[in-house]
Amino acid sequence: MIVQREIERATALLSQGKALDSVAVCGAILAREPKNAIAAHLMGLALKDTGDWAQGEEWLNFSIELEPARGEFHANLGNLLRKREKYTRAAEAYEKALQLLPDHKAARRGLALTLCDLGRYDDAEAQCRILLSGNPADAEALAILGMVLANRGQEGEAEAAYRRAIALDPTSQVAHHNLGALLARLERAEAMAALETARRLGADGYEAAYNLGRASLNANDLGAAETNFARAVELQPGNLEAQSTLAKVRFMRGDPKFARALASACSANRDHVRLQLLLAELLWRAGELTGAETLLHDLLRRKGPNPGVQSTLAAILLDAGRPEEAETHALEAAAARPDGHDVVLNLVTILLARGAAEDARPFIEAQLRRSPDSQAWIAYEATVARVLGLDRYRELCDYEQLVRVFDLEAPPGWSSMAEFNAALAATLSDRHRFSNQPLDQTLRNGTQTSRSLLTDPDPTIRAILKAFERPIEEYRRTLATASDHPLSRANVGASKFTGAWSVRLQREGYHVNHFHPDGMLSSAYYVEVPAETQDPQRKSGWLKFGEPRYAAPTLTPERFVQPRPGRLVLFPSYMWHGTNAIHGDEARVCIAFDMRPVRG
């Protein structure tokens, strides 16, 4: 009787949040009865709540050894294993719990979540359907189903599941938060309301802060975005995504100490290689080559060889004009990680910059066998073919045939392109709120919109996206369907936009030569251009094709296109392209988009 009262006391303390007191009571019970399974299990739960997950797991396992037929013991072990990201073992624990207690709803929900963690979305959905077959009004099961569907790319069905869960249980912070996170990912304006509701209901952790940051960014509320991302970093200073996003937002807002939170986390975690590497990469992108190089040399000295560190150091050294040193580090990195896309890409870039096209060629061919539609490797295939004088270059880079220029007519509702572009320019001006260019892209001395234009409801933006459809179809009709040409073989069936954004070049603004890795067909549409672009000799602000990023003297541009308001240029995403700088105070404003074929 005394032991039973003490177990009840330990349980009450645990439910009151007094985990340490519960541990003490359980310890006293176990000193008298070392094989008391319930006390051992409570000890495991209490230790878990103190944050000692390892000891908690040991005690939960011990309690199961003592009484293996208790389904709730297995379910609680599954909860802790999932917290510890031991997903396979967590799934096994939940499955055992359900063998013993088939109607244990919490265990089935835990199993569905864990299967989702494992990427086993069909199995996760099946568990949700079992729950819903027993109770179609199970709001928790609907919220989990929404998560499963969202992870599987079924955004519409996921949204419907979340909204049904909220209708059944308006107090579900999980459903409100996950709906908001989905809408933020889709860059929809309703995300903010859902996330604010979740916060009022008590969602105040890392994911809530980060997703509020995303939603604020989409709403062009840059101050709120920074505040929320800073909160996310405060909650998880070692989170790479949050640190990277916060630093990039601060950089684009013109903050000279944009990486201060990351630098602080690196100082506190000097052995966290990925954090240190992220800081070096961001410093490099911001032009602070010396600081980035020093950090990586120190990291290699302290932690030893690391292909990711060496590859990034090689890229920095190339930018610093030291290609021989760069090649040494790049070769070592590629030898250690021969299948690493970015590692091999850095090596190939350095080899081509040094004029070693024959040395680069085997790496490119191997990567193309693995990823034949990779825009990066097609770009480098074309570069090597050009250097070596191979016919393949002209097949891939027929600039007259594959770079097409369309001068558009005014969309319905506007009397002229001048009137339309003036309205469009005013709309875009309101969306260009940053002070600096993105930290990790090819724009220099300019700004880029933060929200995709694809989800922007403004009528002028909807009108210009609609106006692009006819020239896109005309472009596609002119393409052959040769199986050995990457653009032609993709020209089958439907295609879709994968991104659309606006760029504003300011004084001395330009684009570094680049390709678009996430597209198949890319573009530039000119909204406003400065008067200096009319000079055909200087070619200020003109679009240029054929010059790689690290060009040899002979690899000069092979085609230029003059920007004009109302002009759309379409071209393969793998083509190297950039712009000449503009030099005056008038801005050059354009819209760009990428497209890919719809698969399956």
Labelled PLM ranges:
Residues T455-E469, E473-L570, M575-G600:
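Catalytic core of non-heme Fe(II) oxygenases with the double-stranded beta-helix
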Residues E395-A490, Y510:
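Non-heme Fe(II)/2-oxoglutarate
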Residues P34, P68, P102, P136, ...:
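Short coil turns that delineate tetratricopeptide repeat
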Residues V3, A37-I38, G71-E72, K105-A106, ...:
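Helix-start (N-cap) detector for alpha-helical repeat units in TPR-like alpha-solenoids
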Residues S15, D49, K83, D117, ...:
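Register position in tetratricopeptide repeats
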